Structure formats: C-alpha cells, structure tokens
Amino acid sequence: MFVRKKTNRSGTISVVVVSKAHGKFTEVKKFGVAKSEEEGDELFRKAQLWLRTHDGQQELDFDDRKGKEVEETERFLGNIDSVLINGTQLLLNQVYDSIGFNQIPDEILRHLVIARVSQPKSKLATVEYLKSYYDEDVDLNHIYRYMDKLYNTQMELAQQISVEHTRKLSGGKIGLMFYDVTTLYFETADTDVLREPGFSKDGKTAESQVVLGMLVSEGGYPLSYSLFNGSQYEGFTMIPMIDDFKQRFNLGKDFVVVADSGLMNKNNVTLLQEAGYKYILGARIKSENANVKQWILSLEKVDKACYNYERENGERLIVSYSEKRAKKDAYNRDRGIARLRKACKSGRITKNQVNKRGYNKFLEISKDIEVVISEEKIAEDCKWDGLKGYITNTDLDAERVIAEYHGLWVVERAFRVSKGTLEMRPMFHFTERRIEAHVCICFIAYKIYKELERLIDINKIGMSVDKVLDAAKTITTIRVRLPENGTYATKTLFLTEKHLAVKPLFDLSDN
C-alpha cells in the first residue's frame, strides 16, 4: 500500500491510501480533500502515519477476508440441492388456488392445467416438460387414467368452482351471459357418436369434429360449456345448454342471454320467451315480414341513429344505422361481386352455385339458361347497407342494448385463446370420456388465463398475459441444504427488470 496525493481539475487535492493487486489499484482509505498545499501536506502526513501502523495488518486482514469469502462461497455452492426454472409454476399455482381449483384433490389436474397454460403440448410432451422444468414425475398412463376419473367424477365440480368464482367477482350475480359455438376438429376422418363431419369454423372439411357451445360472463370468464355431435346445427345447441346451466347452478332468472343472429330461429326465440328468460339477440332484419321491412327501409339513415319497433309480445326490434358499417358493407359486397364477375368471365360458375350462400345470392339463371349476375339483386342489397337489427325483451334503452350485444366479442376471444394459445385443437383423443376431459382441462386453463389477466390489470403491471408468462419462464428458485440444521432454505430469484416488473403477481394475498 502507499499514499496517493492527486490534484483534481477544480484545483483541490485528494489524499488516499491505495493498494495494488494484479495490476489494479484499490482505494483502502480516504483522508479528505484539501483546498491548499498546506492542507494537502497535513493530510499526506496523517496518511503516512496511518500507513505505518496499518500496512502489514491491512494486508493480512485483507488476504484473510478474501480466503474466507472464497471458502464460504464454495461451501454455499456445494450445498445447493436444486435449481428450478419454475417461475411460471409458482405464479400459476397461486392463481389456480385463488380461484378454488385446489378443492379438487388430484394434483395431476393442477400439473395438466398449468402445463396447458405455460407450454401447451401433447400429453406425452407434457410428461417430459413437467420432468425437465419442474422435476415432477408424472406417468403417461397415469394421465390417461386420471382423464377418465376427471370425466366420471370431477368435471361438474370444476365448473361449479368456476361459476362461484365468477359470481364472487360480479357481486353475487351473473348478469349478462354470452353464448356462442365453435367447432373442434380431429386429425382423422374416423367418426363415432360424438365425432362427425359437419360445417367447420376452421375450414376443415375432411376431418371429423365436435361442436363446442360456451357460456361466458360479461368480464369474459368462462361459465360453462357443452359438447355436441359434430353435425349438430348450432341453432339447436343454445336452449338445452342454458336450461341445463340454470338448473345445475340454481341461477334463478337474474341474467340476460346475449347471442348472435346466426344462432337464432323463431323456435329459439319462442323457447326463450316461454322459459321467461331475458335476452338480447341479433336480428335477421332482411327476413322480417314485408311490413317490418318496409318500416326499416323507410328510416332516416343518420349516423348512430337507433329506432324501436314494438311487438305485441313485449319484444322490441331495435334498428341502428352506422356510416362506418355502410362503407364496410359496400366494400365487402364490391369485392365479392368482383370475384363473381371474374369467375363468370372465366366460365367457372355453374348452375349448382346459384344459391343463397355468401355473394352467390347475386347469381341467377337468365332466360338463355346461363348463370348471370343480377344487377337488380345488387341494387336491392345496397338499400340495407349500414343497417343492423337487435331483438330484446329487456327494459334497457336502445343504446345500452346495442352496447351489451357488442360484448359478444368476449366469447369470440375465449374461443380464439382456447383454440390458439391453449391449443385445444386439433384433438388426438378418440373416446368420449377423454375428449370431454381434454376440453375440461382447457376450460380450466382458460379460466386461469382470464384470472391472471385480471390480476395483471389490478396490479398495473402493464404487460399482456403472454409477456408475463414469458418473463416468468426465466425466474429461478434455488434450494440450499443447511447441514447444521438438517433443513433446506429456498430463494426465488428476481434478477432482471422484467422479473421485478412481474414480482407483485407472486404474492396474491391482497388481491
């Protein structure tokens, strides 16, 4: 060690004792900053005096501390029992328990659901994932046996837990209840009682499928679901499911059913009325009787205007007009007609295509027995641009009815996340029990996805669910053996900015 006297840019003089090791200088002790040469000399003398009394001892203490530090670090590292990249598991376990799914006693369900949210894979790949990342040994055959058990004894409890949690968040009531259907296809053309070809919403015409109906709450939480035969007409799925849901969960009539016009027919509306349900439905205004259609087309087309048509049965037809929708209707029709004209010109249009599907509705057969595009039909269709109808028997004003109907996007998003992010389809199970169990696992996984989304919002994390999960995937927990105590100490490490950003989600006791 030696004393360094350094003149600073400001003209002051710094006096420090420094040491040199391995070509690097380290400050050992500072003695101050002098404003004059006299003060600098005085500090320099004090530093030399200190150095004469501490030089040997300092080197000895410093070397001793370094040796102890190395020894303690090596001992600590030698006692590390495990290092797990388990941030996702820790986070999703808390969400799983906070909803109440820990009431289902089988831990294998927890493993399957959390794996479905964090790393959706086949059941075989899930086994490997659980072992690699969480050190969980789960046998594949055990998974299949459990899926049979889930179908036989636990599916009802899972839906009950989900409904009660949603009720709790909604102040004890369900309120709005959105219904829609989608299709789930299989990587096979084989059929049975449940799996059959049908109209596919995924464009899979060759594969067998099932129809999935789902009820979703106003906040987007999944309430209940049912599977139907793959060839089932979607309009026949809604009433049985709502009746069953109401009976199973003792709902009373404190809810309003919201559904798209594609699910509606006169029979469904009649059944809703007879059951005493409140509803908001998409209307097929072009299918109304002549008097109603004449009234609709006589309405003044003012942007965002709403008009009520009272029916005798206490039902209202609400018609709204939107300039934005009118432009979209015209744009889509022009594109469709352009494709039709191109197909007609090339001779690809046949008589079999003269139907009411899509823009084929503008086709007709001429007197010369040729397929032509009807300009009269196009002109008639233009009259309806920008008009949209809604049917309701509620007391809500027209603007509120329209706003609630537009909440149907929550069901569409539920299907999009379940089928895409959570990879509910394609399905590779071929027995009814395991198909139902697979959908139940995905249903619970989506419930956890939605609850995590709510917690992210409450804690003002400012990230999407997917980005939070990505950050959690690199959070590590170490476990260290304490030989003297005969116990273990664990520590979850939040090392990066992203880790620190999501850290509030790892303590959900206040949410």
Where are these regions (language model features)?
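Conserved glycine(s) in the ABC-transporter nucleotide-binding domain "signature"
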Residues: 1-107
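Anion-binding and metal-coordination hotspots
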Residues: 3, 11-15, 24, 94-511
